[in-house]
Amino acid sequence: MDNCLAAAALNGVDRRSLQRSARLALEVLERAKRRAVDWHALERPKGCMGVLAREAPHLEKQPAAGPQRVLPGEREERPPTLSASFRTMAEFMDYTSSQCGKYYSSVPEEGGATHVYRYHRGESKLHMCLDIGNGQRKDRKKTSLGPGGSYQISEHAPEASQPAENISKDLYIEVYPGTYSVTVGSNDLTKKTHVVAVDSGQSVDLVFPV
């Protein structure tokens, strides 16, 4: 008998909890309807891949239950389906991730390569900053390069009007951990190659007498 009373009391608590949860859910739903945002009117971010179109009309049609009264501030159009909402959210997250990867890949800085390697492996980039002579000119170049890849740097002969003894080229390359083959030279006779294994956080200095 005591067991039956305990079970009944437990069922009563569960029933009241469910009723309270249902009432709170309806209140949240009403507040969400009043604060509805028309996402289709917002501008689609550039570079975002995917389809933001709503589901086909014939998939959203439901049997009409009779004339419905539209409250002020509400729209007559049907809300997007759950799958369309998640697809839109995934597209915005992909766009945000791509912008984050571009930021950390554009400027060589401490921790930037580690961030890109950890969170944006599919967007591998090699960034090169080139300083020529004593001037302030910098050329930045991007090219795809994964661990174990090979990158060749060709150095062309300087112009005759510029003194040869004043020319120096310092090349800074920020890469992901891996093994790389670096070749420098203006032709097949003067090309020099070094194979370097780079670990995470390691800095390697290479000198090529050209």
Swiss-Prot record:
Q: Which subcellular locations apply to this protein?
A: Nucleus
Q: What InterPro entries has UniProt attached to this entry?
A: AKIP1
Instruction: List the keywords (alphabetical).
Output: Nucleus, Proto-oncogene
Tissue spec? Expressed at high levels in adult heart and at lower levels in brain, testis, ovary and skeletal muscle. Up-regulated in some breast cancer cell lines. Isoform 1 and isoform 3 are expressed in fetal brain.
> Could you mention a single GO BP entry for this protein?
substrate adhesion-dependent cell spreading
Q: Where is this region: Disordered?
A: 58-80, 136-162
Query: According to its record, what are the GO cellular component terms?
Result: nucleoplasm
Write out the transmembrane intervals: none
Claim: Cell inner membrane is one of the keywords in the record = no
Which PANTHER family does the protein's record reference? A-KINASE-INTERACTING PROTEIN 1 (PTHR14330:SF2)
Subunit arrangement?
Answer: Interacts with PRKACA and RELA.
Task: Describe the function of this protein.
Answer: Enhances NF-kappa-B transcriptional activity by regulating the nuclear localization of the NF-kappa-B subunit RELA and promoting the phosphorylation of RELA by PRKACA. Regulates the effect of the cAMP-dependent protein kinase signaling pathway on the NF-kappa-B activation cascade.
What name is this protein filed under? A-kinase-interacting protein 1
Task: Show the taxonomic lineage.
Answer: Eukaryota, Metazoa, Chordata, Craniata, Vertebrata
